[in-house]
Amino acid sequence: MSPQTETKASVGFKAGVKDYKLNYYTPDYVTKDTDILAAFRVTPQPGVPPEEAGAAVAAESSTGTWTTVWTDGLTSLDRYKGRCYHIEPVAGEDNQYICYVAYPLDLFEEGSVTNMFTSIVGNVFGFKALRALRLEDLRIPTSYVKTFQGPPHGIQVERDKLNKYGRPLLGCTIKPKLGLSAKNYGRAVYECLRGGLDFTKDDENVNSQPFMRWRDRFLFCAEALFKAQAETGEIKGHYLNATAGTCEEMMKRAVFARELGVPIVMHDYLTGGFTANTTLAHYCRDNGLLLHIHRAMHAVIDRQKNHGIHFRVLAKALRMSGGDHIHAGTVVGKLEGEREITLGFVDLLRDDFIEKDRSRGIYFTQDWVSLPGVLPVASGGIHVWHMPALTEIFGDDSVLQFGGGTLGHPWGNAPGAVANRVALEACVQARNEGRDLAREGNEIIRAACKWSPELAAACEVWKEIKFEFEAMDTL
């Protein structure tokens, strides 16, 4: 190497390792309206200061790497780097901190949840300086929201398509989830829809197995729902699961569903992936299909309190990627969900503008501008005695989904559906009359039993069934 070359290499570049906090911890930074803001729950390794840990998260999820590189001089790191701008200790926890990070919008591809997550959570969670890391919330700026189509149709358009107003929608997951032939599966669908449900549903792992190939299932389910529609005079739907091993196969199934004339298809958005989900959502918008989303695999990501991604972030990501329904817990059933936290992300799914409210786990004010809303689906271990609480907790813009709570009725599927519909109508009427569902719920259900033998039988079967475990998802 010539002396001249050595001189040039030494100007403006000093090799070596620097503390992250020197460049990426900026407590004086004033966030911009266009920044994506993240709240991380950080547990540093012993001996690592919280400022260094927060700065490391900002660096490793944006422009930083473990050492200084000479190509840093070829761009403006101040323009593109993430910045840890605020740190606060977590009340009641040792060595846990909420670190707030701001990311410039130019770091992200427009309309791509895949790219957003690859940047923010793709690599940093394995960082050795951190004992644990959890993404608690994101603030998506309106300028980025507007690059997404979002849900194919949204709440109001769905109600107009179904011609159903003023109450929650009722659904049922067909059980057993695996093992039925396509014809017997279709028979169960017909009985549930004829009995008064609005929807029936493929379970998340019903795809195209040897005992029931997807095309056969689609045909028998379409026949069932059209027959139920003709008999009841109500529009019916069955969530036909289009999830597949490839995007091409997924789209083939969605196209076939559209050709059958059914109103709705389904996708497992986490196991299927955000790229596949967004592709399907765009197709559904263009072709008049509603899109039901199952969150299979979510608890692997969001169950631990100090590591992973909170479901409110996954819910926001789904609203951006696209879906008209998504499972959101029940508060009262067999699956995880603390009331205030659940209602926090339910509002993030449905409402246009949500204020910051730390008591419900909402770290940032979120403005969705014109992005359509998503119906939350309450499903998992619920039955007729839960109907007053579910109606009171979730309100009209929701789907209440009873699998075993329909199919487990002692008289069969159709009476099980009748029992759920009667219970729902009784609760909605009582609420509209000004009665307190939380206090008078059992009385309302017992009164309805007097004129519905199907409901009376259901109440007798499930009167002792409770799932009383402490929720792990707490503040």
UniProtKB/Swiss-Prot annotation:
Catalytic activity: 2 (2R)-3-phosphoglycerate + 2 H(+) = D-ribulose 1,5-bisphosphate + CO2 + H2O; D-ribulose 1,5-bisphosphate + O2 = 2-phosphoglycolate + (2R)-3-phosphoglycerate + 2 H(+)
Post-translational modification N6-carboxylysine, affected residues: K201
Binding site for Mg(2+): K201, D203, E204
Cofactor mode of binding and number, as noted: Binds 1 Mg(2+) ion per subunit.
Enzyme Commission number(s): 4.1.1.39
Keyword 4Fe-4S part of the UniProt annotation: no
Residues recorded as bearing N-acetylproline in the entry: P3
Keywords recorded for this protein, A-Z: Acetylation, Calvin cycle, Carbon dioxide fixation, Chloroplast, Disulfide bond, Lyase, Magnesium, Metal-binding, Methylation, Monooxygenase, Oxidoreductase, Photorespiration, Photosynthesis, Plastid
Pfam families hit by this protein: RuBisCO_large, RuBisCO_large_N
Acetylation in keyword set: yes
Propeptide section residues: 1-2
Cofactor (UniProt): Mg(2+)
GO BP annotations, alphabetical order: photorespiration; reductive pentose-phosphate cycle
Annotated site residue numbers, Transition state stabilizer: K334
PTM sites of type N6,N6,N6-trimethyllysine: K14
Post-translational modification: The disulfide bond which can form in the large chain dimeric partners within the hexadecamer appears to be associated with oxidative stress and protein turnover.
GO cellular component: chloroplast
InterPro entries: RuBisCO (IPR033966), RuBisCo_large_chain_AS (IPR020878), RuBisCO_lsu_C (IPR000685), RuBisCO_lsu_C_sf (IPR036376), RuBisCO_lsu_fd_N (IPR017443), RuBisCO_lsu_N_sf (IPR036422), RuBisCO_lsuI (IPR020888)
Enzyme class: lyase
Residue numbers annotated as active site: K175, H294
Subcellular location: Plastid, Chloroplast
Misc note: The basic functional RuBisCO is composed of a large chain homodimer in a 'head-to-tail' conformation. In form I RuBisCO this homodimer is arranged in a barrel-like tetramer with the small subunits forming a tetrameric 'cap' on each end of the 'barrel'.
Subunit structure: Heterohexadecamer of 8 large chains and 8 small chains; disulfide-linked. The disulfide link is formed within the large subunit homodimers.
Function of the molecule: RuBisCO catalyzes two reactions: the carboxylation of D-ribulose 1,5-bisphosphate, the primary event in carbon dioxide fixation, as well as the oxidative fragmentation of the pentose substrate in the photorespiration process. Both reactions occur simultaneously and in competition at the same active site.
Similarity comment: Belongs to the RuBisCO large chain family. Type I subfamily.
Name by which UniProt lists this protein: Ribulose bisphosphate carboxylase large chain
Taxonomic source organism: Nandina domestica
Gene: rbcL
